[in-house]
Every structure is written in structure tokens, then in C-alpha cells.
Amino acid sequence: EEELAHPARKYAPPHGRLYLVCVGSTPVGCIALKALDDTRCEMKRLYVRPEYRGQGIARALVHQLMQEARVAGYRQMVLDTFPFLPEAITLYKREGFYEIERYNDNPMPGSVYLCCEL
């Protein structure tokens, strides 16, 4: 809850990023980047409202975040997701992510851990 109440604490530049996509004045999607160390970052909070899915918004957000991570000097991006989000896992794998061992303390059983070389 702290993370959502104060997102700038975790996702503010220079080490993080937070993007919000709006259609008109309506927020429809978001994505964030969090530094793990000098060379590795984590993709966080990818979300697109259901009524806006299938329009390439998630893919555009992922591309933007990966480009920003490269510019910031990160060489590797990791993320965790859930097995009940197969569309997200397919998107990540299409963008070059591959499965890795657990890298964090995510308490959700069955989480899927992915990595991409930037």
C-alpha cells in the first residue's frame, strides 16, 4: 500500500520510471521501472484496463520501458508475474524475456520469473 500511495519513492528518476497512458483524460494503462543495482532493473506494474486491451498499449509500454532502461545504462531487466496471466507471459517472451529462477521475495506461490538482456 505504501508503494501505491507514494509511487515516486520507488519509481522516480534517475533510477526508476513510471509511465501512465491516457486516452483523452482517462488513464488506461501504466508501467514502472525499479532499480535493483547498477546494471539490473525490474519491470513493475504493467497494467492496461480490460476495455483497452488488444490495441498494442501493453506492447508499447514494454518497448518504452525497455528503451528507457537501456538509455539509463541497465543491461538486464527482470520481472515477476503470475501463471494465470498467460497473455502477459506471451508478450514478455515475444519481447525476449526468458524464465529464470526466483530472484526476489515475492510471497505469491507459483510466480513466474523472467529476464531479458537489454
Task: Give the ranges of each region predicted by the language model.
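Conserved glycine-rich acetyl-CoA-binding loop
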Residues: 26, 40-41, 45, 49-63, ...
